[in-house]
């Protein structure tokens, strides 16, 4: 399927070093456009179900993704995924996804993320709470990306964090100026407070008129 390249609006310098990139999801649109067109070496961080074989992919897509998050009828979701799951299973095999786990295996996710940065690639995380679906105005950022940034910091990597927002209607990916994790530590705020501030900024990138955002460019 052909996906037209979106416009990239940088509010600062282009991403020229291994970084932590945060983005909204917009269903599959955000991950696909970032994977295909963001001009920097990167790996996506995503749910382990999409990296665990065809049966797992089918179950996740048919129930969690299309039924619970996209609100499809369960029968049609299961029927559609008989075709979609094998194709996406092949796609994800080539994606080099960093699988995220909800249990003790998360340690392997964190270590793989650090290795990715050390190998010169950025890590892309989609921290929004999508349990009730995907929304234009995001309601919550999980703070796990800050745990990852903290692990990086303890291993000597002061990771720059970029907030981005994919504006599907305008086919534009807005990329904010980076913030170093060490600068966040100086604020003496909790992870939840910092995550909330990133959430607010992400929503600003998605809601402000593009001409106003252009005025913020460096």
Where are these regions (language model features)?
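Short aromatic/hydrophobic-glycine micro-motifs
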Residues: 3-6, 96-97, 207
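Short, charge-rich binding segments
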Residues: 12-14, 35-36, 89-91, 114-118, ...
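Catalytic core of membrane glycerolipid acyltransferases/transacylases, capturing the structured
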Residues: 16-102
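Non-catalytic C-terminal accessory region of glycerolipid acyltransferases
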Residues: 102-218
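Structured catalytic/translocation cores of nucleotide/phosphate-coupled proteins
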Residues: 1, 33-35, 107
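General small-molecule cofactor/ligand-binding pocket signal
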Residues: 9, 98, 162
């Amino acid at each position: 399927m052909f996906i037209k390249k979106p416009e990239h609006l940088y509010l600062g310098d282009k991403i020229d070093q291994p970084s932590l990139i945060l983005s909204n999801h917009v269903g599959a649109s955000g991950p696909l456009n970032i994977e295909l067109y963001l001009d920097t070496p990167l790996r996506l961080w995503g749910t382990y179900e999409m990296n665990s074989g065809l049966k797992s992919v089918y179950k996740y897509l048919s129930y969690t993704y299309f039924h619970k998050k996209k609100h499809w009828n369960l029968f049609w979701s299961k029927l559609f995924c008989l075709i979609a799951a094998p194709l996406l299973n092949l796609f994800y095999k080539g994606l080099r996804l960093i699988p995220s786990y909800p249990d003790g295996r998360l340690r392997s996710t964190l270590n793989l993320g650090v290795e990715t940065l050390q190998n010169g690639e950025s890590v892309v995380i989609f921290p929004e709470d999508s349990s009730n679906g995907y929304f234009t105005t995001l309601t919550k950022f999980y703070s796990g990306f800050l745990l990852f940034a903290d692990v990086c910091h303890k291993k000597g990597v002061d990771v720059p964090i970029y907030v981005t927002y994919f504006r599907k209607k305008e086919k534009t990916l807005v990329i904010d100026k980076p913030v170093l994790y060490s600068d966040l530590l100086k604020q003496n705020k909790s992870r939840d407070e910092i995550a909330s501030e990133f959430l607010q900024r992400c929503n600003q990138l998605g809601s402000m008129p593009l001409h106003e955002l252009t005025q913020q460019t460096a």
